[in-house]
Curated annotation (Swiss-Prot):
Subcellular location: Cytoplasm; Nucleus
Gene: CSN9
Keywords: Cytoplasm, Nucleus, Signalosome
InterPro entries: Csn9_fungi (IPR016806)
GO process terms (BP): cellular response to pheromone; conjugation with cellular fusion; protein deneddylation
UniProt-recorded name of the protein: COP9 signalosome complex subunit 9
Protein source organism: Eremothecium gossypii (strain ATCC 10895 / CBS 109.51 / FGSC 9923 / NRRL Y-1056)
């Protein structure tokens, strides 16, 4: 049984962090849903077997979370890449989704060039640190190890540029 506060968070368009719910979850269906919301992407939507009555809300949330994840790294994002990752059918819907992320991401849309220039990403997706076993996902794209590896690469790049 999915807790009411979890459902409210899924339905809240501004909510992007679900790890606190995942860590305290004891229900298998709820844990699977929260695992995908925390660490999965739009492509993992079909892994969730329960929650049919909220499928549209969950699908919408995963699109938003996947876009946020794409904005964490690059300074420029092609429309085609974002649309393919989130299964978004047209430019207008993509631009609407980006506007929904304004509190998390500062960006400029280039509708003609079909690019999103990420100026600053204020939010980030949840990070998996092995707190409990994953039930559905083979591995989490954003884990402690991958975050540390990215920081080490960034440090080396900065050190190289300063030489």
């Amino acid at each position: 049984m999915i807790r009411q506060e979890v459902l409210h968070a899924v339905l809240d368009p501004k909510a992007v962090h679900f790890k606190q719910f995942w860590l305290s979850s004891v229900d298998r269906d709820e844990s699977e849903l929260l695992e995908v919301l925390c660490f999965g992407n739009y492509g993992d939507l079909n892994a969730i077997q329960s929650c049919e009555e909220w499928k549209d809300a969950i699908e919408s949330k995963l699109r938003t979370l996947t876009l946020l994840g794409l904005c964490e790294v690059p300074s420029e994002l092609e429309y085609d890449q974002a649309m393919a990752s989130c299964c978004i059918p047209d430019d207008v819907i993509l631009e609407q989704r980006m506007v929904e992320l304004q509190a998390q991401v500062h960006f400029q849309l280039d509708s003609v060039g079909r690019r999103i220039k990420v100026l600053r990403c204020l939010g980030a997706r949840d990070i998996y640190n092995g707190e409990r076993p994953l039930l559905l996902l083979r591995d989490a794209a954003r884990s402690r190890e991958s975050t540390l590896a990215g920081l080490r690469q960034w440090k080396q790049k900065l050190q190289y540029q300063l030489r």
